Amino acid sequence: KTVFVVGYVPDVRWQGVEEPSLPDGSKFWARVSIQTVFEEQTALAGNESKRRYTSSGLVFVQIFCPKSNAQANEFGKKLSEIARNAFRGKSTNGAVWFRNVRINELSPEDLFYRFNVVAEFEYDEIANKEPESGFVPVSPEPPVYFVDGGTFN
């Protein structure tokens, strides 16, 4: 869907993935990151080897719109809506669900107008007591984040 807004698929930068170069200052681009806020124990198991934890946090999709484009603000709003709609009312097959999705307009930077799309997420996982096994998600699928076109992997 983003290709219909700006004429190309904007570059997407991911948290924890080093890029060899800075984004092109004349192009729209996005940065996706998460922040885990809580990992609370939500249920005691009758068997002490497993306990349920609920993890919650925030997904951020930061959208950068080049000031050199006369329609940057308009296109930024449209790109933000695509990102918002990718999360609004959605959950993954792995039981990660999203809520309270919103668009925040931020102060501009030197080269870019900026928008933040923020989605709260939540999922459950089972923690094994054995140290070598670590955490085992209730579902095998980890949180899934926004990708182009408002769909999930």
Task: Identify what each model region corresponds to.
Residues 78-132:
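Acidic-leaning, charged glycine-interspersed low-complexity segments
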Residues 1-46, 78, 132-136:
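Small/polar-rich, solvent-exposed N-terminal microdomains that initiate assembly or binding
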Residues 46-47, 51, 89:
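Histidine-centered catalytic/metal-coordination loop motif
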Residues 131-153:
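Viral virion structural and adsorption modules
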Residues 39-42, 66-70, 124-130:
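Short, cysteine-centered beta-strand-loop-beta hairpins and adjacent loop/turn segments enriched
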Residues 58-84:
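Mid-chain, well-packed structural core segment of small domains
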Residues 51-67, 113-125:
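Oligomerization/assembly interface segments of phage tail-like spikes and tubes
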Residues 24-39, 53-55, 98-111:
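Short, charged, surface-exposed interaction patches
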